[in-house]
Amino acid sequence: MPNTSDPEKGLFLAGLEAHYSARDIEGRILTAIRAAGLEPEQRLSPEELGALDHFHTGGLRASRELLELAQIRAQDRVLDIGAGLAGSARLLAFVLGCRVDCVEPSADFRAGAALLNRLTGLDDRIEVHPGNALELPFADDSFDVVWMQNVGMNIADKRALYGEIYRVLKPGGRYAFQEMAAGDAPTSYFPLPWATDPGDSFLVSVDEIRAGLGDSGFIAELLEDTSDAHLSQTTAYAAPSPLTLGVYVDNLAQKAGNARRSLEEGQVRLVRGVFRVI
């Protein structure tokens, strides 16, 4: 659990909680589901919810691609750090049948995740825990795979982050991730999907990610920059249906527009990787 005895850390966590807060998230989700012509009382599929619950760059498409790269098996125990509404966890549980533990610091997002797990009938395979990435509430050597999408940008202490991930992975375990990395110039457009202002954004370069993970005992299996591919495959965010991130993300158009502009101008880079514990 977060240790807020450090005043500065407590203030930062409070600011992060505010950034990822969504009042009455369960009511918003249910309203959006019905507006999309779906019945919450009937079992929903993760695919139907894909535009709503994958709060990271590339959405459901990016999650599917990372799933393939990570080579997760049905028998694997998976930890999703910073799981949000647990969209990726449901995808993994639905497609592969594996069990997934989620750690999510936002109480609102945990409530939304629990609702969607129940509506998809996957609440027996997914458990959502309070906590944060630097103090994971699990024993050493607990997981075959740690999964993380667009979370590290909010964490300043990368060494501690990588150390915790290494700690909870079993020998031979894999860390599969997607992150925004620092580009050629400082990020100047705010708010962004992950940060209201510069004080919440802690980007490092691709080389620093590789070096930091290597220093923590990981071996790189894959680390690639997918910025250009992402920009060529997507356009500015639109709202083709009621099921969008805008259901619970305030000022989505502005945040998404700033993120795209930052990518186009090279201020940030979109990267993904799979690293293995020795």
What are these regions (language model features)?
Residues 1-35:
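N-terminal auxiliary segments of SAM/dcSAM-dependent transferases
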Residues 134-145:
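A short acidic, Gly/Pro-enriched loop at the edge of an enzyme's catalytic core
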Residues 39-40, 56-74:
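Conserved alpha-helix/loop element of class I SAM-dependent methyltransferases that forms part
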Residues 159-174:
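A short glycine-rich, Lys/Arg-flanked "PGG" loop and its adjoining helix->strand segment in the class I
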Residues 77-81, 85-135:
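Class I SAM-dependent methyltransferase SAM/SAH-binding core
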Residues 222-278:
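Conserved Class I S-adenosyl-L-methionine
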Residues 145-157:
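A short SAM/SAH-binding and catalytic strip from SAM-dependent methyltransferases
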Residues 180-200:
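Short, glycine-/aromatic-enriched active-site segment of Class I SAM-dependent methyltransferases
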